[in-house]
């Protein structure tokens, strides 16, 4: 029988996975940040926020991304950058996973203005570097209040990738406490609904940034009595539980282990939830530099061949059925005859609304510096289309014009239809139908064929994008506006061609 700590599984709103690659760990010298947005209420579509100039006194509306509630306004800046999904026109990328944390530090219901969704998109509209993004996220939450629970953010530009972990001050005060750690060159990071920052260097601004009161706030409100040097962010703000380890850190373990040559094998009992004192490193070195296709495979992972493999091939698991499927319907845990049982939580999962793998490349002009390889639905079975941070249009099948959950998201452009209505003009619904073929007893026969074809198309689109980038650079030197239109048309055509297949 599992302990009651299991029931404190994954706090917060969306149960997402991030994998973060420093430029020294990537095959082409780009930074790579990946994200699966996992929630049964998410219907994947791609947001576009065009660059704009704003008159003095302009205000920006703030919305709670999860609850679709209007939370207030903040002053707008004179100019906002182009934002496509989670990348902007100068190569900044932001991802997130919710860890929840202490209930008394939940930012909801305390008059705060900025939830994690609008914190991401407001920051992307203003930030030119990862460090500036972290400063903006700090400033916005201190000034206007952080209306969320605990979040882990991946924040990157073409030079650096940071893991920023942020907690609201909840009922005690307006603002946030946070620590940001730069991923060393040649290393990768990962997060999955459990805070990962423990103790941290407090005199190394090249590699670690933090809220000025991250320790003092805990002294004043949460009973911390230790030294500054011994302060443990996770222990104070999101204590590890069986559920946090088994459903969160287990995904980090399965993302780390293949790329670091088994370097976290010694932490298996931690990922199992059996030894919560055997914590994994925050970042690990790679044994081979990673390509985008390598990261595709990381984000497709179902813990195959590991102790956590739910397919039933290596050990009995009735949930795998005759097709040895790793997919499980909710809930993660259930009770039977007085005992609590669990399903494993894998990185690739059927309830993703969308997923992306984004690169930032400092050698390219700003409009194509960041490319967002975007896929609606399950990261395992969905091809990813290229969308650049400077694009000014979205392929028709991937935008809000083809459906969103009623009232869902930030209503910049209300959709004429809702996401609950099946729509064969929507990439989400087509990708979802294909993915469903691989579930249950059909998995062992259908899944290999689906991913083989996805990989063929992904390889083709990667090659197409490299050629487009060469052509863009040549055109950019002559006519910048024409180059942006050329790139935007490429994104539209590539997305719609993939949709029609």
Feature map (PLM): residue ranges:
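Cleavable N-terminal signal peptides
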Residues: 2, 13-14
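Substrate-recognition/cap regions that form aromatic- and gly/pro-loop-enriched pockets
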Residues: 322-458
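Histidine-centered catalytic/metal-binding microenvironments
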Residues: 441-501
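Short, well-ordered beta-strand elements within core beta-sheets of diverse protein domains
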Residues: 120-126
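Accessory, solvent-exposed terminal regions and/or long lumenal/extracellular loops of proteins
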Residues: 258-341, 345-347, 437-439, 448-449, ...
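A contiguous strand-loop segment
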Residues: 16-116, 136-290
């Amino acid at each position: 029988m599992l302990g009651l700590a299991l029931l404190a599984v994954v706090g917060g709103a969306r149960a997402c996975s991030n994998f973060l690659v420093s430029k020294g760990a990537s095959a082409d010298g780009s930074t790579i940040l990946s994200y699966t947005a996992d929630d049964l209420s998410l219907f994947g579509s791609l947001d576009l926020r065009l660059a704009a100039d704003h008159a003095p006194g302009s205000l920006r509306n703030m919305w709670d991304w999860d609850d679709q509630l209007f939370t207030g306004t903040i002053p707008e800046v004179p100019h906002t950058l182009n934002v496509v999904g989670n990348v902007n026109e100068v190569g900044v990328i932001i991802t997130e996973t919710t860890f929840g944390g202490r209930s008394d530090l939940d930012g909801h219901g305390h008059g705060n203005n900025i939830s994690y969704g609008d914190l991401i998109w407001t920051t992307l509209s203003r930030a030119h570097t990862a460090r500036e993004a972290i400063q903006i996220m700090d400033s916005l939450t201190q000034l206007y209040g952080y209306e969320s629970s605990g979040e882990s953010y991946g924040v990157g530009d073409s030079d650096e990738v940071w893991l920023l972990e942020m907690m609201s001050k909840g009922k005690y005060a307006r603002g946030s406490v946070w620590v940001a750690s730069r991923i060393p060159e040649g290393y990768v990071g990962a997060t999955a609904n459990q805070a990962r920052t423990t103790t941290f260097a407090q005199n190394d601004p090249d590699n670690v940034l933090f809220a000025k009161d991250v320790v003092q706030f805990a002294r004043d409100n949460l009973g911390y009595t230790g030294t500054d040097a011994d302060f443990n962010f996770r222990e104070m703000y999101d204590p590890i539980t069986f559920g946090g380890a088994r459903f969160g850190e287990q995904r980090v373990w399965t993302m780390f282990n293949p790329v670091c040559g088994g370097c976290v094998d010694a932490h298996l009992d931690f990922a199992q939830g059996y030894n919560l004192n055997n914590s994994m490193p925050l970042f690990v070195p790679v044994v081979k530099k990673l390509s985008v296709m390598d990261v595709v495979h990381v984000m497709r992972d179902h813990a195959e061949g590991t102790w956590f493999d739910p397919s039933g091939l290596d050990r009995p698991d009735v949930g795998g059925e005759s097709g040895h499927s790793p997919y499980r319907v909710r809930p993660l845990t259930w009770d039977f005859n007085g005992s609590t049982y669990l399903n494993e939580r894998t990185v690739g999962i059927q309830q993703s609304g969308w997923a992306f793998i984004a690169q930032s490349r400092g050698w390219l002009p700003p409009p194509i510096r960041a490319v967002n390889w975007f896929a609606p639905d399950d990261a395992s079975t969905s091809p990813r289309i290229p969308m650049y941070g400077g694009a000014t249009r979205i392929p028709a099948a991937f935008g809000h014009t083809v459906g969103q959950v009623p009232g869902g998201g930030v209503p910049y452009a209300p959709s004429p239809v809702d996401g609950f209505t099946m729509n064969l003009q929507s990439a989400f619904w087509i990708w979802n139908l294909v993915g469903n073929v691989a579930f249950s007893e059909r998995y062992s026969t259908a899944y290999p064929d689906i991913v083989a074809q996805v990989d063929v198309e992904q390889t083709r689109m990667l090659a197409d994008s490299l050629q487009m980038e060469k052509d863009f650079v040549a055109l950019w030197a002559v006519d910048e506006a024409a180059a942006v239109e050329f790139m935007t048309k490429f994104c539209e055509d590539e997305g719609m061609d993939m949709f029609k297949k």
